[in-house]
A protein has these predicted regions:
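Intrinsically disordered, charged low-complexity linkers and terminal tails
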Residues: 1-115
Length: 115
């Protein structure tokens, strides 16, 4: 059963390894609702979808954390992902769909722009 869901449009810095080699999604409000405010680690299943259907699948890990956890007044949440074949195909403007099920498994689905 799905217990949380977030949807966002991917930015250049989130997916372009030439723009940033950080492997992170920005921690938007909908992700904070799913993962909370504490550092957490998750197993994840990744998929890349286009008009052709699911083109790539993979498994990996995610880390939810506050990149400014040592700053007393500012927060900057990030969802770090390890290298994953489906994410290598992602582009700025694609849609990111993240769900978490009742067992704590996180599904990361990239949907190609225009699909």
């Amino acid at each position: 059963m799905i217990v949380g869901m977030a949807i966002k449009t991917l930015s250049e810095v989130e997916v372009n390894y030439w723009a940033s080699n950080q492997h992170e999604f920005n921690g938007v409000t909908s992700l904070k609702r799913i993962f909370g405010m504490e550092r957490q680690y998750f197993n994840a299943e990744f998929a890349y979808m286009s008009d052709k259907g699911i083109e790539r699948k993979g498994r990996g890990t995610l880390t939810w954390y506050d990149a400014r956890e040592n700053h007393p007044y500012r927060t900057e949440y990030r969802l770090y992902y390890d290298s994953s074949m489906p994410l290598e195909k992602a582009s700025a403007g694609d849609t990111l769909l993240i769900t978490m099920d009742s067992d704590g498994l996180v599904n990361v689905i990239i949907i190609a722009r225009g699909t």
